[in-house]
Amino acid sequence: LESANQDLDLQLGSLANAGGRILHTGNGTFGLDSGQVIRAGGELTTNGLLDIRASEWTNSSVLQAGRLNLDIGTFRQTAEGKLLAVQSFTGRGGDWSNDGLLASDGSLRLELSGGYRGNGRATSLGDFALNAASLDLGNAASLAGGANVTLGAGNLLVNRGRITAAGDLVASAASLNNYGTLGGGGNLRLNAPALLNERGLL
C-alpha cells in the first residue's frame, strides 16, 4: 500500500501487514490507531508524524517515520525490531527493554520512569538524551550520538557495552558501574557519588 497524500488516515476494523509494506511519502500525519500499528506486523514507513501510545508493546517489525513519538508503558523490542526516525525520535514510558535498533537521523530523546535495558542499539546523528530510573546495558549494547549525549539514571547505571558521543558525553547516576566503553569526542563528565570502572575504558 502506497500513498503520496500529505496526510494518510486509515480507519480500519483490523489490519494484518505481516510480510507486507505500507508507505506514506507525505509529510503530514499518518493516521492509524495505535493498537493496529503495533499488531500489524510487516514494514510501515511515513515521511510524516507517527504517534504510538500503548500500555505495553512488543515490537519485532520495522517502523520508520519522519517524526516518531512513542508513549509506551512497558516496551520490549526483539533483535529483529527497528524503530527509525528521520527528524526526531521522542519516547516516553515506564520499563523499556531493547534488543533491536532505535535510531534517528536527527535527535533522539527517551524519558522513562522505569528502567532501560538490553543488548540493542540506540543511536542518533544529532543530540541524544536518555533519562530513566536505571540503565542496564548488555555486552552487545550501544548508545551513540553524533553530537552531545546526556544520560541520567536515578539509581544505578551499569554499562557492559559502548556509550559514545561525537561531542560531549555527560552521564549522571547515583551509582555508575562501567565494564565497557564510555567515550566522548569532546568533554567527558561523569556525575556519580559511587563509581566503579572494572576493565572498562574511559
Predicted regions and their residues:
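Short, T/G/N/S-enriched strand-turn elements that build extracellular solenoid repeat scaffolds
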Residues: 1-3, 17-24, 39-45, 57-64, ...
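Surface-exposed loop/turn motifs in large extracellular/passenger domains
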Residues: 3-11, 25-34, 46-53, 66-71, ...
